């Protein structure tokens, strides 16, 4: 019986976009069945091992991952006896949870086990049944991971020594001035009623983690558009035909301004005269109602 062919890697464009989002080297990839704490059943994901993190995608072509698992603090990897034919099952024991993995065949199970142990223990395991070429690849990954960790430590040390001048902006202004805790409908109404204040609003997304940009364009007739801004690790990705990943929300706003050559302007209410601070949402709404043309 012929062995199953290894899964084909994702197309180059997808690979490059994922690399920009994760900022980690790809060591191994393939389909995995995952059962995390709280899962009732196994869920099927295209999985990438990048550095010491597993990234889970709904399918092979998805650019943005739906979940990730940091395995750098892996306590142990335990194999499970599977009643299913030609299937490998094992558990990743982590400090805060245990994650069950299942592969479509025993061959890929050995590969996953080998790569996971190599990057977490920083040594090639001796008790894996792999071909010579696969073992060579494990040694290559080991050297890459050692080098990556050294470079990461050096980079972290250099950053700590630098004066954090750029961080002062974030401390004083944790969110861009055009951020409002409003719904999609409320953002639309604010832009329509007060065009002199700007034509772009940053607001919370449909969940508590991500964001959305609402804009009002006047090309032929006024049009309202909405863009999703996904929080991905420490970065933010604007969901466009070609996704754009930026380091913070201030950069997201700047991107829209620059790409439209200033046609898009952040929607900004005036500050309270007495305190010099942004008014509350109720205060903003009340001021807008009383004077729709505040500067």
UniProtKB/Swiss-Prot annotation:
Question: Residue ranges of the PH domain?
Answer: 25-121
Question: Which residue intervals define the domain SH2 in the entry?
Answer: 177-280
Q: GO cellular component annotations, sorted alphabetically?
A: cytoplasm; cytosol; mitochondrion; nuclear body; nucleus; protein-containing complex
Query: Which CDD domains does this UniProt record tie to the protein?
Result: PH_Brdg1 (cd13268), SH2_STAP1 (cd10403)
Q: Which domain of life is it from?
A: Eukaryota
A Gene Ontology molecular function term of the record: phosphotyrosine residue binding
The subcellular location is: Nucleus; Cytoplasm; Mitochondrion
**Disordered: where is this region?**
270-295
Q: What is its main location?
A: nucleus
Q: Which GO terms describe its biological process?
A: cell surface receptor protein tyrosine kinase signaling pathway; cellular response to lipopolysaccharide; negative regulation of macrophage chemotaxis; negative regulation of macrophage colony-stimulating factor signaling pathway; negative regulation of microglial cell migration; negative regulation of ruffle assembly; positive regulation of B cell receptor signaling pathway; positive regulation of gene expression
What's one Pfam family here?
Answer: SH2
- The Phosphotyrosine modification is found at 168
* Alphabetical list of InterPro entries matching this protein: PH-like_dom_sf, PH_domain, SH2, SH2_dom_sf, STAP1/STAP2, STAP1_SH2
User: What is the recorded post-translational modification?
Assistant: Phosphorylated on tyrosine by TEC. Phosphorylated on tyrosine by KIT.
- Per UniProt, which keywords does this protein have? Cytoplasm, Mitochondrion, Nucleus, Phosphoprotein, SH2 domain
Q: How does it assemble?
A: Interacts with KIT and CSF1R. Interacts with URI1; the interaction is phosphorylation-dependent and occurs in a growth-dependent manner.
Job description of the protein: In BCR signaling, appears to function as a docking protein acting downstream of TEC and participates in a positive feedback loop by increasing the activity of TEC.
The protein, known as: Signal-transducing adaptor protein 1
Write down the species: Homo sapiens (Human)
């Amino acid at each position: 019986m012929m062995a199953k062919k290894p899964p084909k890697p994702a197309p180059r464009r997808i690979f490059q976009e994922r690399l920009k989002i994760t900022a980690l080297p790809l060591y191994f990839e393939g389909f995995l069945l995952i059962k995390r704490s709280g899962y009732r059943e196994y869920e099927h994901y295209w999985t990438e091992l990048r550095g010491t993190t597993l990234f889970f995608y709904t399918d092979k072509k998805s650019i943005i991952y739906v979940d990730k698992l940091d395995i750098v603090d892996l306590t142990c990897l335990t194999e499970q006896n599977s009643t299913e034919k030609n299937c490998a099952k094992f558990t990743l024991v982590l400090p805060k949870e245990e994650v069950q993995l299942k592969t479509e065949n025993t061959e890929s199970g050995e590969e996953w086990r080998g790569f996971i142990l190599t990057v977490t223990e920083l040594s090639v395991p001796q008790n894996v049944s792999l071909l010579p070429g696969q073992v060579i690849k494990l040694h290559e990954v080991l050297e890459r991971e050692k080098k990556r960790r050294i470079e990461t430590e050096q980079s972290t040390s250099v950053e700590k020594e630098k004066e954090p001048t750029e961080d002062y902006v974030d401390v004083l202004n944790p969110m861009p001035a055009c951020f409002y805790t409003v719904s999609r409908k409320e953002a639309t109404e604010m832009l329509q009623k007060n065009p002199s204040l700007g034509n772009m609003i940053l607001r919370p997304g449909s969940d508590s983690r991500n964001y959305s940009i609402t804009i009002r364009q006047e090309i032929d007739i006024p049009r309202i558009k909405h863009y999703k801004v996904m929080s991905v690790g420490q970065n933010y990705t604007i969901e466009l035909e070609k996704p754009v990943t930026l380091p913070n929300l201030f950069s997201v706003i700047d991107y829209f301004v620059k790409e439209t050559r200033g046609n898009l302007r952040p929607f900004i209410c005036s500050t309270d005269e007495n305190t010099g601070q942004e008014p509350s949402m109720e205060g903003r709404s009340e001021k807008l109602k009383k004077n729709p043309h505040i500067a």
